[in-house]
């Protein structure tokens, strides 16, 4: 017979208040008759808020014993206050220069800064109020402040984005290519209970893009590729453990790597023959996923982020359209296939296993309809 690990009885109530504003300004000036332009852009946003919550819980652990040999019981009557504040600025200039009649050169620079503050203050009310009282703060609630269950998090990111692009256009070809590079300095200070950690990172992200279009009479072929690197969140990189909830413990991973996503698409269209088709796909390298470990005694979970590769998908579609007098026929076909990789721990072991989920979809739709003419005058 399967033995129960725990029994939880809880009540909770929360209130959240948030505020946000943003503004932007853009100024562009034409420098000469050839079309050389210079633009200035400024963007600012600010948000702040406060979350207050009450939590009353009683957890009985059937596989843990107290000093008297009985089932261990954890009783909590908590008040949590979580103020947050975010502020960001972006200031950039863009310079565009025609090169002849068919080509344009573009360079843009942006300076970005972002500040985030996320705190949590925890107060234990068990010894300050009656057990049946819920959702009310006693006058001396600050005496129940629990440092080990509270945290402080302050982070700032400063980045410089440089983007260089080239455009070309004539009667047959259209071409657009760009490369973006973003060096960043990211710093975070975090305190969880009595644990403290801070770190400063210097990273570089890249954003390549190419778009090519060929057109001749009624036929058109388009190719598009875009890529992007992305850094793990600073909170995931911190080597700290948050055990404020004993049944849901989270850990950081300072060894997380940079993620890289790719997207490609090719399309064909012939308007006179009424046919079109496209095929494409996406792929991710070093995606971040959560690994879950289970505690057999308490039934609790412990999660931490890791990198994993193997997430990709492909898709395609084709369309045919034909008009026959007052009738029209249309045939649509499409298909897709995805491959998703994750870490699972169904047997609640200490070694999670890699799991791959594959999905395939096919569709076909045929439509016929009649064109009706209105009465003549």
Predicted features, each with a name:
Residues 2-5, 9, 57-79, 190-194:
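A cross-kingdom feature marking solvent-exposed beta-strand/loop segments within repeated
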Residues 3-11, 370-377:
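Conserved small/polar residues in nucleotide/adenosyl-binding loops
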Residues 17-57, 75-376:
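Exposed, low-structure sequence patches enriched in small/polar residues
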């Amino acid at each position: 017979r399967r033995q129960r690990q725990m029994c939880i009885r809880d009540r909770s109530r929360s209130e959240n208040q948030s505020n946000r504003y943003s503004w932007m300004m853009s100024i562009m000036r034409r420098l000469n008759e050839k079309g050389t332009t210079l633009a200035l852009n400024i963007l600012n946003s600010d948000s702040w808020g406060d979350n207050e919550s009450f939590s009353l819980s009683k957890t009985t652990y059937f596989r843990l014993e107290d000093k008297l040999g009985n089932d261990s019981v954890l009783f909590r009557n908590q008040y949590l206050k979580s103020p947050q504040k975010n502020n960001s600025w972006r200031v950039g200039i863009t310079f565009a220069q025609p090169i002849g009649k068919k080509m344009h050169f573009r360079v843009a620079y942006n300076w970005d800064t972002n500040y985030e503050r996320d705190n949590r203050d925890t107060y234990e009310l068990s010894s300050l109020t009656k057990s049946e009282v819920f959702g009310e703060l006693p006058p001396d609630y600050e005496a129940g402040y629990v440092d080990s269950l509270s945290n402080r998090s302050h982070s700032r990111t400063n980045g410089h984005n440089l983007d260089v692009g080239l455009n070309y256009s004539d009667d047959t070809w259209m071409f657009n290519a760009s490369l973006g590079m973003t060096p960043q300095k990211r710093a975070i200070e975090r305190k969880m209970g009595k644990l403290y950690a801070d770190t400063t990172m210097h990273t570089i992200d890249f954003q390549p893009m190419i778009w090519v279009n060929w057109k001749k009479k009624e036929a058109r072929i388009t190719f598009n590729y875009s890529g992007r690197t992305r850094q793990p969140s600073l909170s995931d990189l911190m080597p700290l453990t948050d055990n404020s909830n004993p049944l849901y413990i989270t850990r950081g991973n300072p060894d997380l790597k940079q993620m890289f996503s790719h997207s490609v698409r090719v399309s064909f269209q012939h308007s006179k023959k009424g046919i079109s088709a496209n095929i494409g796909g996406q792929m991710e390298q070093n995606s971040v996923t959560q690994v879950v470990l289970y505690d057999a005694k308490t039934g609790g979970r412990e999660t931490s982020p890791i990198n994993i590769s193997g997430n990709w998908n492909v898709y395609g579609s084709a369309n045919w359209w034909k008009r026959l007098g007052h009738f029209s026929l249309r045939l649509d076909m499409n298909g897709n296939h995805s491959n998703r990789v994750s870490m699972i721990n169904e047997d609640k072991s200490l070694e999670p296993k890699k799991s791959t989920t594959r999905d395939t979809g096919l569709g076909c739709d045929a439509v016929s309809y009649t064109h009706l003419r209105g009465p003549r005058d």
